[in-house]
A protein has these predicted regions:
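Hydrophobic structural segments
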Residues: 1-272
Length: 272
């Protein structure tokens, strides 16, 4: 827990967020850690099968709190099963979004952005690195259509896929990214001078109004897919820290795709 707090301090989380140890003994010794985006029942199954002592997720189990934990409720059942199997649950959410080596950096690195900086700066960390929401930087100049293909190849597989806007032949160089819901950063992406903004969960009206105003072009992936790239980075950090401390810990990224959608079909109807 001390490592997670050092890398992704809870004080950086948004006021509405819930981050930290959700269940478990903070002093317990663990030898196996499972990493996932969402604390859903399938991830709990995997944690039990893997005999994990700790599950670290990006999203909290109870963002808005609860007064009851019956096993008749899916979340109540999950937390009960975790406790019965002596598995702790921890999460880092918006504090991981803005921190160095967090969700923003992971997505930027995945799509080849170099020398990125926060799209919406919030401060400087203890190491003197700028932190904040999203990232912006440069890639080798390329056609928008080719960049769309690259994003599709590198994001984790899932039924959602990606959506793109703009002329695919346009040459782009400045790229802004924000993992997860990106509606609130559309204006920041425009003001940054980005040629394209990669994010997720864009709603119809904000996206349409943004595009009416011109650049940047938009690429919309799924919430899960744009936040998942952080997990391999966290895996490496935990493994390296364990090696430095001469401690044996097995760390694994969950194999469960926690997209809510399981299938996709292009719509083909319309007026003739």
């Amino acid at each position: 827990m001390a490592l997670m707090e050092a890398w992704y301090p809870a004080s950086r989380a948004e006021s509405w967020d819930r981050v930290g140890l959700i269940a478990g003994d903070p002093s317990a010794h663990v030898t196996s850690i499972l990493l996932a985006v969402d604390p859903v029942s399938a991830v709990v199954d995997e944690a039990i099968d893997e005999e994990a002592g700790l599950v670290i997720t990006h999203h909290p189990l109870y963002l808005r709190g609860t007064s009851f934990l019956p096993t008749s409720d899916p979340k109540g059942a999950s937390i009960t099963r975790l406790i019965k199997n002596d598995i702790a649950l921890f999460n880092a959410h918006t504090n991981a979004d803005i921190s160095a080596d967090g969700v923003g950096d992971a997505l930027a690195q995945l799509v080849g952005i170099t020398s990125s900086s926060p799209l919406v700066p919030t401060g400087i960390d203890q190491a003197g690195r700028p932190i904040g929401h999203g990232r912006i930087g440069s890639i080798t100049p390329t056609r928008l259509g080719d960049f769309l293909d690259l994003v599709a190849e590198r994001l984790p597989a899932g039924p959602h896929g990606i959506f793109g806007s703009g002329d695919p032949g346009t040459i782009i160089e400045r790229v802004a990214v924000s993992g997860g819901a990106g509606d609130s950063f559309l204006e920041a992406a425009r003001e940054s001078g980005a040629d394209v903004f990669l994010t997720a969960d864009l709603r119809h009206h904000p996206a349409s109004e943004h595009l009416e105003g011109g650049a940047p072009a938009l690429i919309c992936g799924s919430h899960y897919a744009t936040e998942w790239p952080w997990l391999p980075i966290l895996e490496r950090k935990l493994v390296q820290a364990a090696s430095t401390a001469n401690v044996e810990v097995r760390v694994k990224v969950s194999t469960i795709i926690t997209e809510p959608w399981t299938s996709h079909r292009p719509t083909l109807g319309g007026r003739k």
